[in-house]
C-alpha cells in the first residue's frame, strides 16, 4: 500500500507479506499477523505498529516517531530524525535499531538472552533490569552478554540516548 499525501491505516488482518509506504502521512498498523515480512515506512510522518505478530519487521522513518509493540522475529529499524520505541514481547531473532537524531528505547522480556552492542555519539546509554556480563562499558558504548548471550541486539544513534529495559509484561 502506497500513499503520497495521506495516512495509511490497516487493522485486523493476516498476510504473508505487507508493505505500507507513505511520503507525507502516518502509517498506523494494528492487530496484524504477518507470516513473512512486515515493512512500514514514512518519509514525513509517524509509524505506529500495535498488537503485531510477524516473522520479520522492517521499518524506516525520515522525520517522525516510530513505535512497535508485539512479537517479531528479525527486527530492523532505521530513522533519521525522531524517537524509536520498540516493545518486544519475546526475542526471536536479531534486532538492529539505527538512528541519526533521536532517542531509542527497547523494552524486552526479562528472560531474553542476547549479545548487546549499543553505541551513541552524544547521549547516554541506560540498561535497566538486566545484568551485563563479559562486557565493555565506556562513555557512549555498552557491549556484553545478557542472560548468557544469544541473538545480536545492535543499537546505534548519533545524537540521542539509548534505553534498554524489561518489558512490563514479562
Question: Predicted segment positions?
Answer:
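Intrinsically disordered, low-complexity terminal regions
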Residues: 1-170
